[in-house]
């Protein structure tokens, strides 16, 4: 059993028993600092583990561990259609090429680099939803500027094969500029990906671990070798729709590990191995990792709480999601009056995460910040004369696409609405009113206290 699993077991017991973790350590194994040592990554003997499990079993009614708190049913979606909006490639690509969100998000994430405290042997970063890799690549540039001689361990989660390809296109330049880098991509769930360890024994037995030591010293050589991964990815990086929840799930868990062959000696202690990998991240990026209309409990239990557990001492998780109250939502409400896809605020989410973590939250700081620090703006990039006067169809359509993408309006509703021209008229009115189009995101930070 790994440290994180032991900590989860102890945290659940302490929450159910209303017991301090130090008290648990003293009563179970006569060590008040047991939990603190586990969080530092210290190992325990089999005898100690047996005593922990025996104490929990003896203290619980029926001799069984406590049930998990805040059970959240999986989100139900129609498996036959109505797929998650952001998997529609056409709308996604039009949005990212006409709006500045990726750049602005990367700048906001970059501000956190001044507040982290990396420890040897590497600065460890996890991107909980890499997308096309634009945000991560920009953050890695900022990391190199601030920590030019520090080894990097960069891990990212992404289910989409197309996004994995786009991300890998950006890796050669990053490895050329910063050779002391280990780069990992996985398709595992949020509760699995930071540890590169599937929760299900069946999934763990079928896991595919692919390590590539890149030869050469130029980005061109790295690019050619990464391109050779194409057939492997097509064969193994596959997703199905869960018949139970209607959400995309991996067929088999996969981890791809990339690093430079000429830096293998330096990176040996950083390179993860199958069955022997850790989380302990200095920085976790959680930018738009959940659907706008997902429940606060789903976000807390399935996504943010597991990621918060993956922070090392002094580590920081920055979460970012859409805020609304901008010209984009004006377009949506002009067409669908009363529509409000952004009902969950950062304050509600952080309260739910704190509740879900239970006693494990004692080592964490939950920072919602004031609006002037949390909320930031990004724009649809257009020339001034394109959003005033007679607004062309292409500009109006780009603005409409951005608004419905951010609000995550389902395709069946879009098809019904776009049969007429009223949606473009409403879009033009908002563009003229504001002389442009912009959106607001809000951010929050969860940080683990330093030792």
Model region roles, listed by residue range:
Residues 276-278, 298-313:
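A short glycine-rich, Lys/Arg-flanked "PGG" loop and its adjoining helix->strand segment in the class I
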Residues 330-369:
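Conserved Class I S-adenosyl-L-methionine
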Residues 120-133, 154-155:
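Conserved class I S-adenosyl-L-methionine
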Residues 36-53, 386:
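Short, basic-rich loop-to-helix N-cap that marks the start of a DNA-contacting helix
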Residues 134, 141-279, 402, 406-419, ...:
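Class I S-adenosyl-L-methionine-dependent methyltransferase module
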Residues 263-269, 291-306:
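A short, conserved alpha-helix within the catalytic core of class I
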Residues 314-322:
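Conserved beta-strand signature within the Rossmann-like core of class I S-adenosyl-L-methionine
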């Amino acid at each position: 059993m790994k440290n994180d699993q032991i900590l989860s077991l102890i945290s659940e017991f302490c929450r159910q028993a209303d017991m301090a973790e130090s008290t648990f350590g003293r009563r179970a194994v006569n060590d008040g600092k047991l939990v603190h040592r586990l969080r530092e990554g210290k190992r325990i003997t089999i005898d100690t583990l047996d005593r922990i499990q025996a104490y929990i079993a003896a203290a619980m009614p029926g001799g069984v561990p406590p049930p998990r708190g805040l059970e959240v049913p999986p989100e139900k979606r129609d498996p036959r259609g109505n797929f998650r909006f952001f998997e529609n490639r056409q709308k996604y690509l039009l949005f990212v090429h006409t709006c500045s969100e990726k750049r602005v998000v990367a700048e906001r994430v970059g501000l956190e680099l001044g507040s982290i405290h990396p420890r040897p042997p590497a600065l460890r970063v996890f991107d909980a939803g890499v997308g096309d890799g634009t945000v991560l690549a920009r953050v890695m540039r900022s990391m190199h500027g601030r920590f030019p001689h520090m080894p990097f361990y960069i891990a990212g989660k992404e289910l989409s094969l197309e996004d994995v390809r786009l991300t890998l296109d950006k890796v050669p330049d990053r490895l050329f500029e910063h050779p002391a880098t280990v780069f990992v991509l996985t398709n595992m769930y949020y509760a699995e990906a930071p540890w590169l360890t599937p929760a299900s024994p069946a999934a763990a037995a079928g896991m595919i671990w692919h390590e590539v030591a890149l030869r050469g010293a130029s980005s061109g050589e790295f690019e050619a070798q990464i391109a050779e991964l194409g057939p492997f990815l097509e064969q193994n990086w596959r997703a199905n729709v869960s018949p139970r929840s209607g959400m995309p799930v991996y067929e088999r868990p996969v981890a791809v590990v990339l690093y430079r062959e000429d830096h293998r000696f330096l990176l040996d202690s950083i390179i993860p191995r199958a069955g022997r990998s850790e989380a302990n991240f200095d920085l976790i990026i959680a930018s738009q990792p959940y659907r706008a209309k997902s429940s606060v409990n789903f976000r807390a239990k399935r996504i943010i709480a597991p990621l918060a557990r993956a922070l090392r001492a002094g580590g920081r998780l920055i979460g970012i999601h859409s805020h609304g109250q901008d010209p984009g939502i004006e377009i949506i409400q002009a067409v669908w009056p009363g529509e409000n896809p952004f009902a969950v605020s950062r304050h509600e989410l952080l309260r739910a995460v704190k509740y879900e973590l239970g006693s494990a939250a004692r080592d964490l700081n939950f920072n919602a910040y004031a609006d002037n620090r949390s909320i930031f703006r990004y724009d649809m990039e257009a020339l001034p004369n394109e959003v005033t006067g007679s607004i062309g169809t292409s500009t109006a359509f780009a603005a409409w696409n951005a608004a419905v993408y951010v609000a995550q309006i389902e395709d069946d509703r879009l098809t019904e609405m776009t049969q007429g021209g009223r949606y473009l008229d409403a879009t033009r009115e908002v563009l003229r009113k504001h002389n442009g189009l912009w959106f607001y995101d809000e951010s929050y930070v969860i940080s683990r206290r330093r030792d």
